[in-house]
Amino acid sequence: TMQSHLDMVPQKNSSVKHDFLTDPIDAYIDGDWVKARETTLGADNGMAVAFAMAVLADKTLTHGPLEALFTINEEVGMDGAVGLKPGFLKGEILLNCDSEEEGE
């Protein structure tokens, strides 16, 4: 099971007027990183969602049974994951595609 979350935490610097529903993100490249000026980027786990969807869609890959789990509210209590019923997932291994190293 490939697991990732769908939601984003919209945050901005207090000195900036930005409406996350209507204003675009001002993204830029900084070395190997894509960053945003004055706001969160909004790509927190988007790469993991894209990865899971690409693996599921690619019929040329050889693999066993796959499933994807997309949750919400991982930052404020794991609401999406907590709502899962026991036995809903069939996989024996869950790959959490949203982790980071301490200090990163």
Protein language model regions, located:
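Active-site metal-coordination/substrate-binding segment of hydrolases
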Residues: 1-70, 74-77, 81-92
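C-terminal domain-closing interface element
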Residues: 89-104
